[in-house]
Amino acid sequence: MNTLLMHCRPGFEGEVCAEIAEHAATLEIPGYAKSKPASAHVEFVCQDADGAERLMRRLRFADLIFPRQWARGPGFIELPESQRIEVLLAELASYPVCGSLWLEVLDTNAGKEVSTFCRKFEKPLRAALVKAGRLQEDPALPRLLLTFRSGREVFVGLAEPRNSALWPMGIPRLKFPREAPSRSTLKLEEAWHQFIPRSEWDKRLAPDMLAVDLGAAPGGWTWQLVNREMRVTAVDNGPMAENLMYSGLVDHQKVDGYQYRPRQRVDWMVCDIVEKPARTGALIETWIGEGLCREAVVNLKLPMKQRYAEVRKILQRLRESFDARGLKVAIGCKQLYHDREEVTCHLRRLER
């Protein structure tokens, strides 16, 4: 199992290659990354047979920015037109018994076509794996991840459930709320799923908390905050959706989001303004560093070519700034499924 397969947003293969190559070099695990443009996946081929397993053991998947999902295996294998299950059972003879099964496809148009095959194939495959003793429901065992590039080509991979994506392919199935004024609302909801354990939502996303939404109009992110019954200051020169204003929980301030400062410390600051990432990074530094908020979810827009390098530079600058202030801040950064040319950062001040 010398190959690490990583899913990603189409067009961001280069960022995944740069990110995993840097980590592998730091960990002294030799190998090389390979990908094709807009293929929505990257393979990192390790020189050592156990290289992919060592990478997964030494890295926290949650700390990776651009990969949506990962799995280790020997690479893609060919399947015949018939007797696919028999071939897979033979391939799995050297694998450990697995505790769960996910059939995955790539986030491409071809992948959408393959998903129909996967839905039909999963039930008989699952039954065959259970009968052969290769699959038993146990969250402590590795997860079997079968990534189909077509009905005839599959990556037979493994990953630990606690150190891989929360959802198949890293894609959450969130329902767009009809009352929300824009689809951007799903970005904030996904961020909460990604960065906050569900068991902590009632405590950290509680009613009557104070929140500020910078660049709020028309209110996609504000809607999520109001839905949690928070009191929100929506900062934007543009108009807000009427249903949000009627809630009685929103104070609309028509000022520049980068200039606004709250009169008192708030629980949450969220920001989805289209601006250069360095300027937004400085905004994060001010709000968290000066204690204007306890937690923040902020999007960094990435129109430039060296996108991974830019994100890494901003995150490093934030860490150095907080260290210099003597602050303990948890920082997470991920390109979410609902993100486009951007990444989402989550920051939380931790009391020393």
From Swiss-Prot:
SUPFAM superfamilies: S-adenosyl-L-methionine-dependent methyltransferases (SSF53335)
Binding site for S-adenosyl-L-methionine: S184, A217, P218, G219, G220, D236, D256, D272
Keyword set, alphabetical order: Cytoplasm, Methyltransferase, rRNA processing, S-adenosyl-L-methionine, Transferase
Coiled-coil portions: none
Known catalytic reactions: cytidine(2498) in 23S rRNA + S-adenosyl-L-methionine = 2'-O-methylcytidine(2498) in 23S rRNA + S-adenosyl-L-homocysteine + H(+)
Cytoplasm found in the keyword field: yes
Enzyme class name: transferase
EC number in record: 2.1.1.186
GO cellular component: cytoplasm
Cellular compartment(s): Cytoplasm
Cleavable signal peptide: none
Disulfide pattern: none
Pfam families linked: FtsJ (PF01728), RlmM_FDX (PF18125), RLMM_N (PF21239)
Main subcellular localisation: cytoplasm
Catalytic residues (UniProt): K301 (proton acceptor)
GO terms under biological process: methylation; rRNA processing
Keyword ATP-binding on entry: no
Entry-linked PANTHER family: RIBOSOMAL RNA LARGE SUBUNIT METHYLTRANSFERASE M, RIBOSOMAL RNA METHYLTRANSFERASE FTSJ DOMAIN-CONTAINING PROTEIN
Assembly mode: Monomer.
UniProt cross-references to HAMAP family, sorted A to Z: 23SrRNA_methyltr_M
Record's function text: Catalyzes the 2'-O-methylation at nucleotide C2498 in 23S rRNA.
Annotated NCBIfam families: PRK11760.1
Family indicated by similarity: Belongs to the class I-like SAM-binding methyltransferase superfamily. RNA methyltransferase RlmE family. RlmM subfamily.
Protein name: Ribosomal RNA large subunit methyltransferase M
